[in-house]
């Protein structure tokens, strides 16, 4: 398929698990369908960026990831900076007695571009959406470092993880 999910046959589109190269995840297929239908209707659409499709594992603790791992970023030639923040240092995670795991941010050392975010811990499958959104908007580590997060929330761990990239996490 092309970026609009069109096959080689005129007027035929394909989405979901049958499309090679796309993750076999409900949210991936759903967004591919939205892109296809929007394109069919002649409305403005934005293609799905396969690197920005979050992977989610619904277990305990939960796992959420998007983008490149540290190893893959280095293989791709990036100079990387990494920030890591443990949920044991997050107030809300302690309050709900669910503080196993951490958030790891992989960024480009020169420009602060967010290359990947990997989470294992409480509500990881929810938290990963913040990373996906900021990556889609081409936000930087600095952009997230200065985004106000409510307190006490598990999402504050995202703020601390991004701040940790620059050695400025306040809750460690």
Predicted regions and their residues:
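Non-catalytic, surface-exposed connector residues within folded enzymatic/regulatory domains
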Residues: 27, 47-51, 67
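Solvent-exposed alpha-helices and their adjacent loops that cap or buttress functional pockets
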Residues: 6-7, 11, 49-50, 95-98, ...
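Flexible, glycine-rich terminal cap/loop adjacent to redox cofactors
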Residues: 41-42, 58-172
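FAD-site-proximal beta/loop scaffold in flavoenzymes
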Residues: 1-42
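Short acidic-hydrophobic sequence patches enriched in Asp/Glu that either
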Residues: 28-32, 49, 123, 136
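Flexible, acidic loop-helix segments that line cofactor/substrate-binding pockets
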Residues: 46-62
């Amino acid at each position: 398929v092309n970026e609009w999910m069109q096959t080689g046959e005129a007027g035929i589109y394909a989405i979901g698990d049958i499309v090679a190269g796309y993750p076999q995840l409900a949210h991936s297929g759903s967004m591919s369908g939205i892109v296809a239908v929007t394109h069919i209707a002649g409305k403005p659409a934005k293609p799905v960026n396969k690197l920005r499709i979050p992977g989610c594992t619904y277990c305990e603790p939960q796992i959420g990831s998007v983008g490149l791992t540290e190893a893959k970023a280095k293989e791709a030639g990036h100079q990387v900076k990494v920030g890591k923040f443990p949920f044991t240092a997050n107030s809300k995670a302690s309050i709900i007695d669910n503080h196993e795991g951490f958030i790891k941010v992989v960024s480009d050392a020169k420009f602060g571009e967010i290359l990947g975010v990997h989470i294992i811990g409480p509500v990881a499958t929810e938290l990963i959406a913040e990373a996906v959104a900021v990556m889609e908007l081409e936000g930087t580590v600095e952009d997230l470092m200065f985004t106000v997060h409510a307190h006490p929330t598990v999402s504050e761990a995202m703020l601390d993880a991004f701040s940790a990239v620059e050695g400025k996490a306040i809750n460690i």
